[in-house]
Amino acid sequence: PQVESCVVVRRIEKRTAMKAGRDFWWDDVLAPEAPQCEPERMGANDPLFILYTSGSTAKPKGILHGTGGYLLYATLTSKYVFDLKEHDIFWCTADAGWITGHSYLVYGPLSNGTTSLMFEGVPNFPKPDRFWEIVEKFGVNILYTAPTAVRSMMKDGDRWVNEHDISTLRLLGSVGEPITSKAWMWYYSTVGHGMCPIVDTWWQTETGGIMITSIPGAVDMKPGSAALPFFGIEPRVIGADGAEADAGERGSLVLTRPWPGMMLGVYGNAKAHKDVYFPTPGYYLTGDGAY
């Protein structure tokens, strides 16, 4: 596929250079359309989207996800990891252009009938209480954000949190990188007032959804630990020799069974799909270390 047209949202009062025949205003495109339309029926393995990721190195790879498996996995992980209810206000602070935004800002919450809050901006502008102002204003029940944001808000101090009534929060989530024990404890005690479970989640663009996590009310929490595999996920740690590592021994994190949300492949590069992710038969190589 290739991009042939660009639909532009009139977001700010600024002159935009538009190319006739290629660029179209969002409101002009929508104006003649009905507010509702019948959904298009798709096959389970029809492509749903391509997201480009490079990890920490290497050339960006177009990760291709399918319709049926991805949607199923985004729906189930949203439901059980976040204990979603239809009346919840769910706030995933990720950008919609990344996999976290795809799975837990758009597809996951909406497929469960939950209200999803979309945010544009940064946590500390115009003031360091921006997040807590939004939580209070909209009655957010579940907050899913990155450790980087947690550390930044922790640095700003407790008073910015305490100035707002954020008692509607009932569950907190962490995504994107390991969260330190210090940041975890601040998140739990200051933001959650010691009452909100924290789900520390590990997953990747390629996996489509959460793979390792605690389940609120079912799995004990441990600061700095993503806890246990999600239902049906079987991870292992292997050493440089390809053998399974002993308890406490560092190695490479691999997955030994397929799951619904796994990517269909690397778009246009079947060789990279095999060489990068399946160099050892029977294992999906995550590229992450573990012990």
For the regions a language model picked out, list residue spans one by one.
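Short beta-strand->loop structural element characteristic of the AMP-binding/adenylate-forming
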Residues: 1, 62-64, 115-123, 199
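Conserved pre-ATP/AMP-binding loop-to-beta segment of ANL
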Residues: 3-8, 19-52, 59, 69, ...
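Gly/Ser/Thr-rich phosphate-binding loop
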Residues: 27, 111-114, 141-145, 154-221, ...
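Short Gly/Pro-enriched turn/cap motifs at secondary-structure boundaries
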Residues: 39-42, 220-229, 244, 280-282
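Conserved S/T- and glycine-rich ATP-binding loop of Class I adenylate-forming
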Residues: 47, 53-56, 78, 90, ...
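Conserved AMP-binding/adenylation subdomain of ANL enzymes
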Residues: 71-89, 99-142, 156
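Active-site glycine-centered loops adjacent to acidic/histidine catalytic or metal-binding residues
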Residues: 95, 176, 203, 227, ...
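Conserved ATP-binding/catalytic segment of the ANL
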Residues: 246-248, 254-291
